[in-house]
């Protein structure tokens, strides 16, 4: 069913563009270009990096599931904002794992030698790609279930404590 509360925004190479309804509800503020519709807000042909959709009526996971059901073959859809029904869509195959794989390969680092940390669904592919994928204890249930291990929560500096432990050199 069509959800008339959905509003749209876009992250481009030139900045943020979104509908007035999207920016009125945004918890984050940035310099944006807003108009009645996203089409009106986007001047000409900009390199859209990410299309954003926001719902006022669906829970974040339900909105993501609905978006994936409708758009799965067209875009990579995910979400990264806890408690906000904000779906982030990009070209298929564009996600953190792809960028991390490219970066690691450019430096001759094998996936088995990579440790990745994540807390939200937008980190899932990255955790699956890395040799050691660790979820933050305060993270999304899907990451906690898929990770190789769990580190302390964000409020407990879980990532920092784990990095410090991993970098310790043997004393003997």
Kindly give the residue locations of the regions a language model identified.
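Conserved acidic, metal-coordinating active-site core of Asp-based
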Residues: 2-117, 121-122
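Anion (oxyanion) recognition and catalysis
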Residues: 1-2, 144
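Mg2+-dependent phosphoryl-transfer enzymes with acidic/Ser/Thr/Gly-rich catalytic loops
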Residues: 89-172
